[in-house]
Amino acid sequence: MKQLKENKGIERSLLLTMAVIAGLTVANCYYNQPLLEMIRHDMGVSQHEANLITVVTQIGYALGLCFLIPMGDLYSRRRIIVINMSVAAVMAVFIAFSQRVWIVWGASLLLGACSVIPQFFSPIAGQYSEKKNKGRNMGFVLSGLLTGILASRVVSGYVGEWLGWREMFIIAALIMIVCLILTLKIMPQIDSNYVGTYRGLMKSVFHIVASNARIRLYAIRAAFSFGSMMAIWSCLAFRLAQAPFFSGSEMVGTLGMCGIAGALAASGLGKLVNQWGIRKLSLYGACLQLVAWTTAYLFGDTYMGLIVAIILVDIGLQCLQLSNQSGCIQEMPEASNRANTIFMTTYFIGGSFGTYCAGLAWTHEGWMGVCAVGAVLAAISLCITICCTK
């Protein structure tokens, strides 16, 4: 394992490994989405209670981002990653054998918290890549992460239909074991760059939030965009179970394939960060999401309308996430994990908020309410960008 040096470049094999593991680990947070209707029926709970599984998973991820990712500046990242993978595997097994929904909530919270591993990789790509390749390499890791998010829905949709929702989480546990072995074999040791205690480290995170307006801006507008995207996925299984579709989890998985092509565009978008700038990409991304939700509202009773909406909302999110996350890390390269913690914690709070609001909207107003929530969140992101010059 070659020792990494700041701004000196990363081997392609390590970059590829990080992208693959990023996709496989973040997938833990999204396996449940196509399976919500199956879980609801199996456990005899309401749609709102089933939707809370997705909500607590996102909250868990946000907690992991807030309290675990900063440790990458203090302790061995390799060791933290290995521990997280081990706990994630155990929690996936807990979910698979749970007979009560509250156990699923608790295990999902911890599974989400331990699935933050990709957020150790993005700072590595940003910190150790050559300056000319930073955006491209971060985009490459992001494409792996986004492909994992979307492919996880495809896989879980089909596995749920063919084998059952519990079997999907057993498979997830096995995947974590494989990732753990890969990490031990390929991931190099990276020296910590913070001298002090964990308490002091966390204080420095809050100091960065209070003192750096740009990082706050980058994080907040991306968070609203992520909330907009999560709105469509958190209620898609419920929508497809109704007229005129009457479809199961396998169709949710099939629609997930539509977003994969868009996710692969993230590596290409990385090149545009330097050319177009963060603000322009943020404007384009929010506008794409507004078009997506208009399409979902007007043509949401057709598969073609849903496909177009899914593709546009995903590409719009990528424009915002890649540009703003890159901006955060480059703003404070000496504290890359802490800057990324601020960005991604805010980001997933936005995702949890979007998921929760969409669930309430679905309960009271159906698909029209979900579209309204998604459009409002995208519009807020757009307004923030219009009002700011950064």
What do these predicted regions represent?
Residues 65-76, 264-278, 362:
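Helix-to-loop junctions at the C-terminal end of transmembrane segments
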Residues 107-143:
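Cytoplasmic helix-loop-helix junction between adjacent transmembrane helices
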Residues 279-324:
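C-terminal transmembrane helical hairpin of 12-TM major facilitator-type secondary transporters
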Residues 2-9, 188-220:
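Juxtamembrane intracellular "pre-TM" segments in multi-pass secondary transporters
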Residues 79-93, 280-295, 375:
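Structural signature of the two symmetry-related core transmembrane helices
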Residues 117-129, 319-332:
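Intracellular juxtamembrane helix-capping segments at the cytosolic ends
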Residues 63-101:
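Conserved MFS/SLC helix-loop-helix module at the cytosolic interface between two early adjacent transmembrane helices
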Residues 103, 140-187:
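Helix-loop-helix hairpin linking two adjacent transmembrane segments in secondary transporters
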